[in-house]
């Protein structure tokens, strides 16, 4: 069973520019993510998908393989699934797990649990969203990535860490867009 762990890291984040290179716990966020994936039991290969040479250099320094993301997949409005499919096309595997480095306090055990559940159920997503694992078969047959089906097996794990990196402006934008549609807001 070959497991590819990935980090998708754009330099051009509009919400928090250079976010993936900013220091967290003394390391660039992308570097910390690579270290977390390296500490898992089940991830065999670590790939960072990016359009940025700066992020690519840091990723290589931390021992990850870099996959250049085409500009068409490096836009704000592109869902994650096409990016995952691009990774799997270039790095064949049985299971792909993406580590969302917006949640940098995630423990390696959460990533391993997502992989185990994906093997059992084809797709698993941690709550909070730190690890999203899918079998290669599931990714190849995902359907419309712009309107993904809600088939992922959701599992709560306090080791995912409640931290999510955003700006105040970003959070206010989400609040305005969802106002009246989210319970408790």
Language-model features: locations:
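Conserved acidic residues
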Residues: 3-4, 44, 94, 122-124
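Short beta-strand/turn micro-motifs composed of small residues
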Residues: 9, 50-51, 100
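Short phosphate-binding loop-to-helix
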Residues: 47, 53-97, 105-110
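Conserved core of the sugar-phosphate nucleotidyltransferase
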Residues: 77-86, 95, 100-185
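Short beta-strand scaffold positions
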Residues: 49-50, 165
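A short, N-terminal amphipathic alpha-helix
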Residues: 29-46
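Short glycine-enriched, charge-decorated loop/helix-capping segments at active-site entrances
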Residues: 19-24, 72-73
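N-terminal nucleotide-binding beta1-loop-alpha1 segment
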Residues: 1-17
